[in-house]
């Protein structure tokens, strides 16, 4: 691995816990720079303005790439006037990562409702917007544990849609694309020469030979067999309810799940505080803490930094492999 360039930590929604997490993230030991408005940081934060990632600052001082916002941060009360600046920060971070000035980005949480209300934000979330900024590349979301062994890494093949729509949205093309993106990312970003991927069935007991649904037998198993012949190390379709105990996780490196809760319930149960959100398929590294803006505790100084610290460390490790 090579020495990675600094990570950009975007400010996220300034009315959330992002501003108080930034100085706490110095405990990660990872070189990073905060991109946002320093006026939103907690009172007493030691910070120094830099003009480019990597400019030296004193130990224990937060390096800040300044991006001024039009309104102050009121904890728990997002201001629509700040929405355009939140979006600009994300785009600026992507420019820095794609130009090579930064090793990657770690994004603090945004509030989609506030962005839509204040700036007409037309994307479901960070992931889709980042894919758009990168040239509308196909991406998948991975959630990865950092404190449990064997690791739990999950990829929901369908994400933010009603459960009733999953059977139609889970297509052979979508699953194949997710397998290919995940396999490539596990090789490049996790250093695995032959990633082992487990594929969860859609139905209870993976359909139980068609008794509880036929998607597994009708098209999932044939797709998996075809990709095996190409050289992919795949197992499945597997019953999802027995995929996540320690002995099962030891048999694969990442699990592809049919829908949101099938993937996120196990990761959040096993490693709620230490989970990291990773976008696979981008031309740059992107991670984020696995939590939201937490308006209910914003500004109180009690937000747990474990997930953002884990996300920064993972971004740093991934960037060092690129």
Curated annotation (Swiss-Prot):
Substrate binds at residues 126-127, 268, 277, 286. It is found in: Cytoplasm. It holds the Pfam family PdxA. GO terms for molecular function: 4-hydroxythreonine-4-phosphate dehydrogenase activity; cobalt ion binding; magnesium ion binding; NAD binding; zinc ion binding. Its EC number is 1.1.1.262. The keyword Zinc applies. NCBIfam families: pdxA, PRK05312.1. Its cofactor is Zn(2+); Mg(2+); Co(2+). It comes from the Bacteria. Pathway: Cofactor biosynthesis; pyridoxine 5'-phosphate biosynthesis; pyridoxine 5'-phosphate from D-erythrose 4-phosphate: step 4/5. It catalyses: 4-(phosphooxy)-L-threonine + NAD(+) = 3-amino-2-oxopropyl phosphate + CO2 + NADH. Belongs to the PdxA family. One of its GO terms (biological process) is pyridoxal phosphate biosynthetic process. The active site is located at the dimer interface. It comes from Paracoccus denitrificans (strain Pd 1222). Binds 1 divalent metal cation per subunit. Can use ions such as Zn(2+), Mg(2+) or Co(2+). InterPro entries: PdxA, PdxA_fam. A divalent metal cation binds at residues 160, 205, 260. Homodimer. Catalyzes the NAD(P)-dependent oxidation of 4-(phosphooxy)-L-threonine (HTP) into 2-amino-3-oxo-4-(phosphooxy)butyric acid which spontaneously decarboxylates to form 3-amino-2-oxopropyl phosphate (AHAP). Keywords: Cobalt, Cytoplasm, Magnesium, Metal-binding, NAD, NADP, Oxidoreductase, Pyridoxine biosynthesis, Zinc. GO terms for cellular component: cytoplasm. The keyword NAD applies. This is 4-hydroxythreonine-4-phosphate dehydrogenase.
């Amino acid at each position: 691995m090579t020495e990675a360039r600094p990570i950009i930590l975007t400010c996220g929604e300034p009315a959330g816990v992002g501003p108080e997490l930034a100085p706490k993230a110095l405990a990660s030991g990872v070189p990073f720079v905060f991109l946002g408005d320093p006026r939103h940081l907690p009172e007493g934060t030691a910070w120094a303005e830099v003009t480019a990632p990597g400019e030296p600052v004193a130990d224990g001082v937060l390096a800040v790439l300044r991006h001024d916002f039009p309104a102050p941060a009121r904890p728990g009360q997002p201001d629509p006037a700040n929405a355009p600046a939140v979006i600009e920060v994300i785009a600026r971070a992507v420019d820095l990562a794609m130009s090579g000035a930064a090793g990657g980005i770690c994004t603090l949480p945004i509030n989609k409702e506030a962005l839509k209300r204040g700036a007409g934000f037309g994307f479901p979330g960070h992931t889709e917007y980042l894919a758009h900024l990168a040239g509308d590349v196909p991406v998948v979301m991975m959630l990865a544990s950092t404190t449990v062994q064997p690791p739990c890494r999950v990829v929901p093949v369908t994400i933010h849609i009603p459960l009733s729509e999953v059977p139609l949205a889970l297509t052979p093309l979508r699953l194949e694309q997710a397998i290919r993106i995940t396999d490539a990312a596990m090789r490049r970003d996790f250093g695995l020469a032959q990633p082992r991927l487990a594929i969860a069935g859609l139905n209870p007991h993976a359909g139980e030979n068609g008794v509880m649904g036929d998607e597994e037998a009708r098209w999932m198993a044939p797709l998996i067999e075809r990709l095996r012949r190409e050289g992919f190390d795949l197992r499945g379709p597997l019953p999802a309810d027995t995929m996540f105990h320690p002995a099962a996780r030891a048999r694969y490196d990442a699990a592809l799940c049919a829908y949101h809760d099938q993937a996120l319930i196990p990761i959040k149960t096993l490693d709620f505080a230490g989970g990291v959100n990773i976008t696979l398929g981008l031309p740059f590294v992107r991670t984020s803490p696995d939590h939201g803006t937490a308006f209910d505790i914003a500004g109180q100084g009690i937000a747990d930094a474990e997930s953002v610290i884990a996300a920064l460390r993972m971004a740093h490790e991934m960037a060092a492999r690129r």
